[in-house]
């Protein structure tokens, strides 16, 4: 007997140390439950219906399903008892006037024999006496297995999560009423409608998923009618919450604990108040209001009056109004003087550099004058002329470089070399000089030698012609006084080579958003500039100080994961790219908050016997996943010889222990062991040695309980 007892102790010790390393026994899923009231939404507790496929779209937009049609007579809606289309968003989203949101745990239990997690509740009433039913007057619905028992029958539930696909998973559901399951944002199970318990199965191996890749798993369930509520889930999907908002809701939007109107109101009507970004970490004890966002309201300028400024007015509760006149810029450094503001054109200026002896150019706030070189270039660059500008005479003028000598000898004529402009004199002979010319003060002596005898042919004195074709030169024959009267050109025109021509620069209004034109009649026209759109993906505007400005065309995003972009002038959408910081971290986009980061899960080659280990990249090696044996190994992963030996002695060491106990204590020993262990070994819940056979004959070792 002592030997047997010793053996028992040893075997029990072995059994204690042979731990089976496996998955968690229980997995908890945080779910959001939205309590509904039939008196607020008649889609809850309507007439009886049945299953109705096709009520929602096949692609999940955001974190909640959307209806497949806007037509209330859409057949799936009629069959599914859905009438209040505008209230459907409140089934799975918080709305303080339509529902009460609650957070609950859904605990799934592992069946070790199948490695399947399950949740089974024939009476699934998770929010009795809660939500709207805190008010006793709302507790008016009865049913369930105890038909007269009160229950909260009207609610919707959602779970948003992610999982790493292992390659073998399935998902099974049975229950009532509406159930929709999305994997990778695609509808894979549709049990919509108001119906008794219905079942459906999703085989993930048929969805085209890639092993070891992350996918979203979104589950939506509604209980809409008495008298029953059943939920049964069976799955081996290892779903988890990639991130939670600051309210503790998995992939939540922060609305559970933040109301922008109540928590974020800064009493400034000129700001747009919003709750913090959902994934913003908020230290415990801090108020959410400390992290609220307040964006200033931007007012657009009115198109019909460019001389006023609009802004947000606190006095009119945040309306955009005219708050002042436009302050036109000082353009003195450009030699421009403000003349006023035109409502259609904006600020108007005139140039200070318009004048007979001004070039029209401005240099650091000073107008450039016409000097000798400028006038020489304008009037012909004759080396025998002296060029200058005289404002009174209308601009540039040219006078002879070489004049008559001071001597009174009329026969001494000044000369100038045409190539170098060297002055000299030439003395005429008596024939050339004296032909009895009678001269007035505006004439000089000249004898025509082409005839014999020479005759007098007087010439105008040199000072009459100023060399400027834009002046009218007049000499008083009595006094000899010479005047140079500028030709009159109206408005913006200016004389050039004796003709009045339009000068565009004379119409410069200092506004780069106008096209300035000088007409032949001298009037200025300022036409608003139309910016030439050379790139259809650019939006062009005009700034009076810098002209046309092109900025990229803004294409709106759709949610947080679809980025708007412009292609050949057309707005399109593309997926937001989220970069992972390391090999062992996954970055992907969440519709609620944008890019998120969570730890990578490596899928082992043999999940029953191994665990996946992620190893980050180093300077010499890339990142990788490795499969590592459980330590200690699960029994089913032992070498074949060990397993065979165990089978021989009774499937497991624990069985051997029981067998010895049976030898020692017979049937009562077995019963005592079974009772003390709550029949925890499924393979040994009965012992054929001590059971009465169901067929013919008797078992001599069978002892009925006394």
Curated annotation (Swiss-Prot):
Keyword presence, Glycosyltransferase: no
Keyword Signal in annotation: yes
Location(s), subcellular: Membrane
Membrane topology: Single-pass type I membrane protein
Signal sequence range: 1-23
Biased composition (Polar residues): 693-706
Keyword terms of this UniProt record: Glycoprotein, Membrane, Signal, Transmembrane, Transmembrane helix
Topological domain ranges for the Extracellular compartment: 24-644
Gene Ontology CC: extracellular region; membrane
Segments traversing the membrane: 645-665
Cytoplasmic topological domain residue ranges: 666-706
Region of interest: Disordered: 687-706
Domain PA14 residues, every copy: 109-253
Residues the record marks as carrying a glycan: 95, 107, 212, 296, 429, 521, 532, 616
SS bonds (residue pairs): none
PROSITE patterns for the chain: PA14
Protein family membership: Belongs to the prespore-cell-inducing factor family.
Identification of the protein by name: Protein psiG
Organism: Dictyostelium discoideum (Social amoeba)
